[in-house]
Amino acid sequence: LKDYRCREGSINNDGIILGISGLVVNKNKSYSNMKGIGFKEELLEFDKDECILNKKNNIDRYILKGNDYNKNVSIVINTDSGKYFNKMLDVSESKNIEINLLMNTSFLRDNITDNYNHSNILYKGSSLSDLNNFSSLLHNEFFCVKTNDYEIINDCKNKKLNSIKMNNEIKKDLLINTKKLLNNGAIIFIRENEFNLSELSSTINYIKSRGYNIVNINELLS
């Protein structure tokens, strides 16, 4: 294990692209571990080298995507009718990947049980009271997502929650449109509908064939 510095992200008027934190040797602790023994690599101790553009220090800015350095992407289903999301989850499970669900409070209350992976759930809404209700139901820490003109970040930053800006949502022609959006750190938002369900399996296969890892949103934005 070698040390390496933070690889910083970037910032523009729309928001931030996260960097990737590094590891640096803690010389004092490492020396103390090896005193009287001599150098042993396994006794090195490291400290995290945090980037400026990290989640913790940027709750007042929208996150646009994950870092540009790892070949990771994340798929988020923007729930709608509730008719198709379970079948879409079944497809992802058959491919041994995790995908995420974006929903409001009423959808969470009516459709999500304890059997679901709550850590892969994201929030959309248009009022502070809705956010409070969502939080009381889910309990987990989660990401907020701006899906329209409502500045959801104003509600979420007061609860120390990070916000993501959804710049593109794929409503149909999933495979073709995924090819256009695919890059390191991409968050691929797809509408919950029959069109995207029918192309989800082939789209996952394509993403993997291009050498990308499909990870959950927490890993992508870690």
Please report, for each region that a protein language model flagged, where it lies by residue:
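Terminal accessory/targeting
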Residues: 1-75, 83-86, 90-99, 183-222
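Metal-dependent polysaccharide deacetylase catalytic core of the NodB/CE4 family, i.e.
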Residues: 71-73, 81-174, 178, 182-188, ...
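N-terminal beta1-alpha1 ligand-phosphate binding loop
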Residues: 78
